[in-house]
Protein backbone atom coordinates (compact mmCIF):
# COMPACT_ATOMS: atom_id res chain seq x y z
CA UNK A 1 0.00 0.00 0.00
CA UNK A 2 2.90 2.33 0.74
CA UNK A 3 4.35 1.77 -2.73
CA UNK A 4 1.01 2.66 -4.34
CA UNK A 5 0.87 5.84 -2.26
CA UNK A 6 4.42 6.80 -3.22
CA UNK A 7 3.72 6.17 -6.90
CA UNK A 8 0.53 8.22 -6.73
CA UNK A 9 2.37 11.12 -5.08
CA UNK A 10 5.13 10.90 -7.70
CA UNK A 11 2.53 10.89 -10.49
CA UNK A 12 0.82 13.91 -8.92
CA UNK A 13 4.10 15.82 -8.72
CA UNK A 14 5.03 14.90 -12.29
CA UNK A 15 1.60 15.87 -13.62
CA UNK A 16 1.71 19.15 -11.71
CA UNK A 17 5.12 19.96 -13.17
CA UNK A 18 3.99 19.15 -16.70
CA UNK A 19 0.83 21.25 -16.34
CA UNK A 20 2.81 24.09 -14.77
CA UNK A 21 4.87 24.34 -17.94
CA UNK A 22 2.37 23.36 -20.63
CA UNK A 23 -0.72 25.39 -19.69
CA UNK A 24 0.96 28.83 -19.95
CA UNK A 25 2.57 27.74 -23.22
CA UNK A 26 -0.84 26.74 -24.60
CA UNK A 27 -2.41 30.05 -23.56
CA UNK A 28 0.51 32.06 -24.96
CA UNK A 29 0.47 30.48 -28.39
CA UNK A 30 -1.78 32.15 -30.98
CA UNK A 31 -3.88 29.10 -31.87
CA UNK A 32 -2.88 26.97 -28.91
CA UNK A 33 -6.10 26.93 -26.92
CA UNK A 34 -8.31 25.81 -29.78
CA UNK A 35 -5.84 23.17 -30.88
CA UNK A 36 -4.91 21.81 -27.45
CA UNK A 37 -8.11 22.24 -25.45
CA UNK A 38 -8.64 18.49 -25.09
CA UNK A 39 -5.07 17.93 -23.92
CA UNK A 40 -5.40 20.60 -21.22
CA UNK A 41 -8.73 19.19 -20.05
CA UNK A 42 -7.32 15.65 -19.99
CA UNK A 43 -4.31 16.77 -17.96
CA UNK A 44 -6.53 18.66 -15.55
CA UNK A 45 -8.84 15.66 -15.14
CA UNK A 46 -5.83 13.43 -14.47
CA UNK A 47 -4.55 15.92 -11.88
CA UNK A 48 -7.90 16.08 -10.06
CA UNK A 49 -8.15 12.28 -10.06
CA UNK A 50 -4.63 11.99 -8.63
CA UNK A 51 -5.43 14.52 -5.89
CA UNK A 52 -8.39 12.42 -4.74
CA UNK A 53 -6.40 9.18 -5.09
CA UNK A 54 -3.56 10.54 -2.95
CA UNK A 55 -6.08 11.69 -0.35
CA UNK A 56 -7.79 8.31 -0.22
CA UNK A 57 -4.50 6.40 -0.07
CA UNK A 58 -3.23 8.75 2.64
CA UNK A 59 -6.28 8.05 4.78
CA UNK A 60 -5.75 4.31 4.37
CA UNK A 61 -2.07 4.43 5.31
CA UNK A 62 -2.23 6.67 8.38
Swiss-Prot record:
Transmembrane segments: 8-28, 41-61
InterPro entries referenced in this protein's UniProt entry, alphabetically: PSII_PsbZ, PSII_PsbZ_sf
Keywords of this entry: Chloroplast, Membrane, Photosynthesis, Photosystem II, Plastid, Reaction center, Thylakoid, Transmembrane, Transmembrane helix
Gene Ontology biological process terms in this record: photosynthesis; photosystem II stabilization
Pfam families for the chain: Ycf9
A single GO cellular-component term on record: photosystem II reaction center
Subcellular location field: Plastid, Chloroplast thylakoid membrane
Membrane topology, from the record: Multi-pass membrane protein
Principal subcellular localisation of the protein: plastid
Keyword Amino-acid biosynthesis tagged: no
Assembly description: PSII is composed of 1 copy each of membrane proteins PsbA, PsbB, PsbC, PsbD, PsbE, PsbF, PsbH, PsbI, PsbJ, PsbK, PsbL, PsbM, PsbT, PsbY, PsbZ, Psb30/Ycf12, at least 3 peripheral proteins of the oxygen-evolving complex and a large number of cofactors. It forms dimeric complexes.
Task of the protein: May control the interaction of photosystem II (PSII) cores with the light-harvesting antenna, regulates electron flow through the 2 photosystem reaction centers. PSII is a light-driven water plastoquinone oxidoreductase, using light energy to abstract electrons from H(2)O, generating a proton gradient subsequently used for ATP formation.
Assigned protein family: Belongs to the PsbZ family.
Listed HAMAP family: PSII_PsbZ (MF_00644)
Name used for this protein in its record: Photosystem II reaction center protein Z
